[in-house]
């Protein structure tokens, strides 16, 4: 199977438990507080357009997701850039084209909303994720540098 029986659709508030479960399987850690904030922003804020997607099997089981944001901007005018901040594919379904299908649908959805650029942050030591984004035509930004300060 190369993602062929997988349907990509907009994320719904009812997907919370499945998304948190997939993330926990991927990271071997639970982050419900992170997803509480993400879902709050996604489904209750009027400042962001729906952009997050899920990958769903024919039986309704979620096997992956991608979350991003498109800020509406001042006076309801959307920005030409969006962010991709979280992506996850259930480890039992990896290497089947689901991540690529999610990224492609995410890109097409944003393109239809007038987005010209997608930004994301990746740990430079995460070679798997770096390879995934590189193979999906993401490249290091020429204009933005992530700065940090240890405290």
Summary of predicted features, one role per range:
Residues 50, 142-146:
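Short hydrophobic/aromatic beta-strand or adjacent loop that forms the aromatic wall/cage
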Residues 10-14, 21, 25-79, 85, ...:
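Acetyl-CoA-dependent GNAT
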Residues 11, 87-89, 122:
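Hydrophobic adenine-recognition pocket in adenosine-nucleotide-binding enzymes
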Residues 89, 95-108, 135:
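Conserved acetyl-CoA-binding loop-helix of GNAT-fold acetyltransferases
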Residues 71-73, 92, 125:
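Short coil/turn motifs at secondary-structure junctions
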Residues 110-122:
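Conserved GNAT acetyl-CoA-binding A-motif
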Residues 100, 112, 124-142:
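Conserved active-site alpha-helix within GNAT-family acetyltransferase domains
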């Amino acid at each position: 199977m190369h993602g062929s029986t997988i349907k990509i659709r907009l994320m719904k508030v009812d997907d919370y438990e499945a998304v948190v479960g997939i993330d926990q399987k991927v990271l071997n850690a639970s982050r419900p507080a992170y997803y509480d904030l993400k879902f709050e922003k996604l489904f209750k804020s009027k400042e962001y357009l729906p952009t997050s997607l899920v990958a769903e099997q024919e039986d309704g089981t979620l096997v992956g997701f991608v979350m991003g944001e498109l800020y509406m901007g001042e006076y309801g005018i959307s920005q030409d850039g969006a962010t991709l901040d979280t992506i996850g594919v259930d480890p039992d379904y990896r290497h089947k084209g689901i991540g690529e299908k999610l990224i492609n649908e995410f890109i097409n959805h944003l393109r239809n909303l007038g987005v010209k650029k997608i930004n994301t942050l990746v740990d430079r030591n995460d070679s798997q994720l770096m390879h995934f984004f590189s193979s999906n035509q993401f490249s290091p930004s020429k204009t933005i540098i992530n700065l940090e300060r240890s405290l």
